[in-house]
């Protein structure tokens, strides 16, 4: 057995006495030491090693004249005896798991006797030494990996799989070790899959970014001739990755607190995304930990909103404002698993490079350093290295021993240790002026308020409060009103000072208004203080501010009170959008050089132009122009309110222009012609309501589910609807709610008409009478300024359809195309809808009827025209030459037929471009709505494909061109599967402009009836539309028109589009249902299945617009007019009997073929050969 331990400098005997009285001299316990300049420090370090290994009973001391080394753990460790060796023989090699940290020391193993007591020496050291040769220390997995990579040589790399096979360590452990060593800066990971791992080159030891501590750079390499220390001091538990998690946790906590300090509150998901994480669960545990520490608190349940506590916010505020040096590292670690932390190391000076070398091995007990806050703010000092706690090396001054034997100033860098500072330096640091001291330069409160005023009012006020180190709260004083129209009153409180409250329909707006009021008062006070006015004049009582909010605002903040945190341009556009008016920013002039331009802008709303303004940029000029327009509008609203209420002032422009008080023509058209969901949400928002959709029920198999949805607007539930998809269910529910809401609330007087009762299904007859029959029931023109002729046509169409569908049916819901024909008795007449229809489908080939019982084409334009024919039949049945004054007819030339009076005109409205040639253009060709008295057409002929005849797709949407060859559809061919061909709506409107709307049968009694105008709501291009509906046939001049016989002509109607809204493209297919109505039907709607051509329902009833029913009307009219020669004819023979019409139709088809547009495709002749029994004259 060896009698001593051979160290690097000599042989030391084993010490058997374990405890000594404190009164003994330290010199009695000095060991024999070799001679040399570094013998004493090396022997002292060896004594530390012997003590930590349990071979010495007492911690060694070092005099003040000598230098000490950093301890293994932070804190002041007192001198105390060690436990018996036999009790801790199994624990000494797992030191980190059994250590218990105290405030004044640490303890291993069983309880220790008090330092002042005496006891017999422990006799376990000899036993430990006697079995010392039998003990061995295995290398840690990290050390094995580093050794293996070192054996490969510098610049050589390998994969994790190879390392796992060679070292016989599981691959997942190898991966963990490799990434841990990479984080510590010891390994380099190359690109590729799998990555190649290699040692970090020695040249990169000092190239790490600032703030990153490389543990290797803090350790000196020992001579290769002394490998004993490396093997003796090995501790497998020291290289575990335990500290990495607390370090990440601390960094996440710091980021969370910093983010919550900048924003008042946030959800867990928002927090995670703003600090670099992805999911809420990544920060949930950290937030709960911070909540236990009293740093954050939460409100709400799903999901909770997190806030900083007031104490934590104050601490962060003080920390940010003082800019003081970072606090020293704590002297004790509260957790048993916490590893020591070392300050960042710096590269040595050039002169010391020869004595310092970076270690290539992972030393025992080495851990990454803790990241200190505000490390970059520490004043720079000389670059020096700190030796590792276990190994020999040159020490430095600054670690002195106190009288009680403690290791003083552990782990505190010299540049942060106030013990060694010069006299008075510590006091100078503590008495450093704060950030808000008047001696430091910073902007004035008035300047800061001016900057904050340009931001959102709430954000600006909070920023100003933070700037002045004040607390700012928004208190909810009162909440009133029903659930569908609540009112919230908020008040701003800054450091206990209360400001005037503000009330609005939402919490957000109320907070903004309250912030605007508080900001205006603070701005006025700060301005008065800067101008030198007495301070008592700048402060106004809260009562005066609350009673006179307009006087409390400075002139410079008047615009802010108008816009409630939004830009002037946005606010103006929103107001005009609510009012249904168009707003335009006009550039009047541009002056000045390129480096200093001047732009002059003005705002034009309808026919009204507001004062121009100039600014150095277009953006600023537009904002200033919008501000001038808003001020002018507010003055007009205030003056009108004074005239009506005797001088009562309105609080804001929004209230004076409340949409529930003033509604315009564009609102109805805009909401009914947009996407149903978007239209309902916009309608609800503009009226101050909240809208939502709720899934009531779900049933049916997975391949054919049924969803029942219900809309809720302003606390009111609307009828439920059923659909086969959730998207369609929401759209149908929105359509139903929108139709009911507008139908109930819309009144004629609110649209500028005389007093008319609300248009509902029950009062439709009276409404139509008031709008069409009574000359005194309505004004001659629409009084709305800015509305165009086409706007009036569109309004009448949608208003009539909305009134008819007030008591909705589920089959009416969803996206649809609307067409209507409006009649005007004279040019000054407002007009009345005489026929309307919806739909976008054609009949299937297997649903054709030989008896005329199906409607072949259910597109909206065709259905409205068939309804118009029924309206003409009803008017003809009422015609009497004695009462012809009230009729729309008059005798034509020759007296044999009737004709439409010259003052009566008919106008067609379609909510979108007609299918076929009229819709074949892209968005860039769309024209804006322009009110023009010129009716001249400018058709577009850009390529030979334009103008071609097209047919509709069977059981679908869209059109395809006809073939050039002759096509004769046959009944049996279609029944056997041949494609059914139906001409497009553009082609049929072209035929109406040549042959008339009345058709062949009515030509027996009437002269041709032509359209006066065509109005579109969407997809309007004047050149493409005019080419499609009339100008195709006159492309080569008047040759075609000259070939027509009297009374047929080529009619060129006036065309235009709606201007009060801009419809957006709606996705999804239209429904198969089709609605038809004419004035003769009262308020009775008929709903068809467009693919079957019959009434929608199980009975498949005959439609009133079918060939059979129209032919029945014709037979009644023949009997009434004593045209018995026509009663015995079939449907096809009666049409051919109209000789003039038949000749003109054949000429029209032949001309289209000759012009190269293609062949007109008709239905099989077999379906026109049905008869009806003669109808007796009633």
UniProtKB/Swiss-Prot annotation:
GO biological process, one term: negative regulation of hepatocyte apoptotic process
Annotated positions binding Zn(2+): 859, 915, 985
All residue ranges annotated as the Z-binding domain in the record: 135-201, 246-310
Domain DRBM: 456-524, 567-635, 675-743
Stretches the record annotates as C-terminal extension of DRBM 3 and constituent of a bi-partite nuclear localization signal: 744-750
Chain residue numbers at which the record places covalent cross-link Glycyl lysine isopeptide (Lys-Gly) (interchain with G-Cter in SUMO1): 371
Post-translational modification: Sumoylation reduces RNA-editing activity.
Region N-terminal extension of DRBM 3 and constituent of a bi-partite nuclear localization signal: start-end pairs: 665-674
EC number: 3.5.4.37
Modified residues (Asymmetric dimethylarginine): 30, 42
Keyword annotations: Antiviral defense, Cytoplasm, DNA-binding, Hydrolase, Immunity, Innate immunity, Isopeptide bond, Metal-binding, Methylation, mRNA processing, Nucleus, Phosphoprotein, Repeat, RNA-binding, RNA-mediated gene silencing, Transcription, Transcription regulation, Ubl conjugation, Zinc
Domain A to I editase: 835-1170
Phenotype of the disrupted gene, per the record: Mice do not survive past 11.0-12.5 dpc, and embryos display widespread apoptosis, a rapidly disintegrating liver structure and severe defects in hematopoiesis.
Location of the region described as Disordered in the Swiss-Prot/TrEMBL record: 1-40, 221-244, 316-383, 527-564, 631-657
Residue positions, PTM Phosphothreonine: 757
Modified residues (Phosphoserine): 231, 238, 434, 567, 582, 589, 763, 772, 774
Gene Ontology molecular-function annotations: adenosine deaminase activity; double-stranded RNA adenosine deaminase activity; left-handed Z-DNA binding; metal ion binding; RNA binding
Induction comment from the UniProt entry of this chain: By inflammation. Under normal conditions, long forms starting at Met-1 are dominant. Inflammation causes selective induction of short forms starting at Met-519.
Active site (record annotation): 861
Bias (Basic and acidic residues): 360-379, 527-550
Name of the molecule in the record: Double-stranded RNA-specific adenosine deaminase
UniProt source species: Mus musculus (Mouse)
């Amino acid at each position: 057995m060896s009698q001593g331990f051979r160290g690097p400098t000599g042989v030391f005997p084993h010490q058997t006495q374990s405890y000594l009285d404190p009164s003994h001299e330290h010199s009695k316990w000095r060991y024999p030491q070799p001679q040399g300049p570094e013998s004493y420090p090396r022997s002292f370090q060896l004594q530390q090693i012997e003590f930590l290994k349990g071979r010495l009973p007492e911690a060694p001391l070092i005099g003040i004249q000598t230098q000490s080394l950093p301890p293994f753990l932070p804190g002041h460790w007192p001198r105390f005896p060690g436990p018996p060796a036999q009790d801790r023989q199994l624990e000494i090699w797992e030191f980190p798991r059994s250590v218990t940290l105290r405030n004044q020391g640490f303890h291993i193993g069983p309880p220790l006797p008090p330092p002042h007591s005496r006891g017999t020496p422990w006799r376990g050291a000899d036993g430990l030494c006697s079995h010392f040769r039998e003990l061995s220390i295995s290398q840690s997995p990290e050390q094995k990996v580093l050794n293996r990579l070192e054996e490969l040589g510098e610049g050589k790399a390998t994969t994790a799989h190879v390392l796992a096979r060679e070292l016989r360590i599981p691959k997942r452990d190898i991966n963990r070790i490799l990434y841990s060593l990479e984080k510590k800066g010891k390994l380099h990971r190359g690109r590729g899959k799998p990555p190649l791992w290699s040692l970090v080159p020695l040249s990169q030891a000092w190239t790490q970014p600032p703030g990153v501590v490389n543990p290797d750079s803090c350790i000196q390499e020992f001579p290769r001739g002394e490998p004993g220390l490396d093997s003796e001091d090995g501790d497998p538990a020291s290289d575990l990755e335990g500290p990495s998690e607390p370090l990440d946790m601390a960094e996440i906590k710091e980021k969370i607190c910093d983010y919550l300090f900048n924003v008042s509150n946030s959800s867990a998901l928002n927090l995670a995304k703003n600090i670099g994480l992805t999911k809420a669960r990544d920060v949930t545990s950290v937030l709960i930990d911070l909540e236990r520490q009293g740093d954050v608190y939460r409100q709400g349940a799903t999901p909770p909103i997190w806030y900083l506590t007031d104490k934590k916010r104050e601490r962060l505020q003080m920390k940010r404002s003082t800019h003081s040096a970072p606090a020293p590292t704590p002297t004790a670690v509260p957790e048993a698993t916490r590893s020591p932390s070392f300050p960042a190391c710096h590269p040595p000076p050039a002169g010391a490079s020869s004595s310092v070398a970076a270690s290539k091995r992972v030393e025992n007990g080495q851990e990454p350093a803790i990241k200190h806050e505000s490390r970059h703010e520490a004043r720079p000092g000389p670059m020096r290295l700190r030796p590792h706690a276990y190994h020999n090396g040159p020490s430095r001054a600054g670690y002195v021993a106190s009288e009680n034997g403690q290791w003083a100033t552990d782990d505190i860098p010299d540049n942060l240790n106030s013990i060694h500072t010069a006299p008075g330096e510590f006091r100078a640091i503590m008495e450093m002026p704060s950030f808000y001291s008047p001696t430091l330069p910073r902007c004035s409160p008035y300047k800061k308020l001016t900057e904050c005023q340009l931001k959102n009012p709430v954000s600006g006020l909070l920023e100003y409060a933070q700037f002045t180190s004040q607390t700012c709260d928004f208190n909810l004083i009162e909440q009133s009103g029903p659930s569908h129209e609540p009112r919230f009153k908020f008040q701003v409180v800054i450091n206990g000072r209360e400001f005037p409250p503000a009330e609005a329909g939402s919490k957000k707006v109320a907070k903004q208004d309250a912030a605007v009021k508080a900001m205006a008062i603070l701005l006025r006070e700060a301005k008065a203080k800067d101008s030198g006015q007495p301070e008592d004049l700048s402060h106004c009582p809260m009562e005066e501010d609350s009673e006179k909010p307009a006087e409390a605002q400075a002139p410079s903040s008047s615009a802010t009170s108008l816009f409630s945190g939004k830009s002037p341009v946005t606010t103006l556009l929103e107001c005009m959008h609510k009012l249904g008016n168009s707003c335009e920013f006009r550039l009047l002039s541009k002056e000045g050089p390129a480096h200093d331009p001047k732009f002059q802008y003005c705002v034009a709303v309808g026919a009204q132009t507001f004062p121009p303004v100039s600014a150095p940029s277009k953006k600023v000029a537009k904002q200033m122009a919008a501000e001038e327009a808003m001020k002018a509008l507010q003055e007009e609203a205030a003056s009108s309110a004074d005239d009506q209420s005797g001088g009562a002032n309105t609080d804001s422009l929004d209230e004076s222009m409340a949409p529930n008080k003033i509604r315009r023509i564009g609102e109805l058209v805009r909401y009914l012609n947009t996407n149903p969901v978007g239209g309902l949400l916009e309608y609800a928002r503009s009226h101050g309501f909240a809208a939502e959709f709720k899934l009531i029920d779900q049933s049916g198999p997975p391949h054919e589910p049924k969803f029942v949805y219900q809309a809720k607007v302003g606390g009111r539930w609307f009828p439920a609807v059923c659909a086969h998809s959730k998207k369609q269910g929401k759209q149908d529910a929105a359509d139903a709610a929108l139709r009911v809401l507008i139908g109930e609330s819309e009144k004629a007087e609110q649209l500028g008409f005389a007093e008319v009762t609300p248009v509902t299904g029950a009062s439709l007859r009276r409404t139509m009478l008031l709008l069409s029959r009574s000359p005194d029931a309505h004004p001659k023109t629409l009084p709305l300024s800015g509305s165009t002729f086409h706007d009036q046509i569109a309004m009448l169409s949608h208003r009539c359809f909305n009134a008819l569908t007030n008591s909705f049916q589920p089959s009416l819901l969803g996206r649809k195309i609307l067409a209507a024909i409006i009649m005007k008795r004279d040019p000054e007449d407002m007009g009345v809808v005489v026929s309307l229809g919806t739909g976008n489908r054609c009949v299937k080939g297997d649903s054709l009827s030989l008896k005329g019982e199906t409607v072949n084409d259910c597109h909206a334009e065709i259905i409205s025209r068939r309804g118009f024919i029924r309206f003409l039949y009803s008017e003809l049945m009422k015609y009497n030459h004695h009462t012809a004054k009230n009729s729309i007819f008059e005798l034509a030339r020759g007296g044999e037929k009737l004709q439409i009076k010259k003052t009566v005109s008919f106008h067609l409205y379609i909510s979108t471009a007609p299918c076929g040639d009229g819709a074949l253009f892209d968005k860039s060709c769309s024209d804006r709505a322009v009110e023009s008295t010129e009716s001249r057409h400018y058709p577009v002929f850009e390529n030979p494909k334009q103008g071609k005849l097209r047919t509709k797709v069977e059981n679908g949407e869209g059109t395809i061109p006809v073939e050039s060859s002759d096509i004769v559809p046959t009944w049996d061919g279609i029944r056997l599967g041949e494609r059914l061909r139906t001409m497009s709506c553009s082609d049929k409107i072209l035929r109406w402009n040549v042959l008339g709307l009345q058709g062949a049968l009515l030509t027996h009694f009437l002269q041709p009836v032509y359209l006066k105008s065509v109005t579109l709501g969407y997809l309007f291009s004047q050149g493409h539309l005019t080419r499609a509906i009339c100008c195709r046939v006159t492309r080569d001049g008047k040759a075609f028109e000259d070939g027509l016989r009297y009374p047929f002509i080529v009619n060129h109607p006036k065309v235009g589009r709606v201007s009060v809204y801009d419809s957006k493209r709606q996705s999804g297919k239209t429904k198969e249902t089709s609605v038809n109505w004419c004035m003769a039907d009262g308020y009775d709607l008929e709903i068809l299945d467009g693919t079957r051509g019959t009434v929608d329902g199980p009975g498949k009833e005959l439609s009133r617009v079918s060939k059979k029913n129209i032919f029945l009307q014709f037979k009644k009219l023949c009997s009434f007019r004593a045209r018995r020669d026509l009663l015995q004819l079939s449907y096809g023979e009666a049409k051919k009997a109209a000789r003039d019409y038949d000749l003109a139709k054949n000429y029209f088809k032949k001309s289209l073929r000759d012009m190269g547009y293609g062949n007109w495709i008709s239905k099989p002749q077999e379906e026109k050969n049905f008869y009806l029994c003669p109808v007796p004259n009633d």
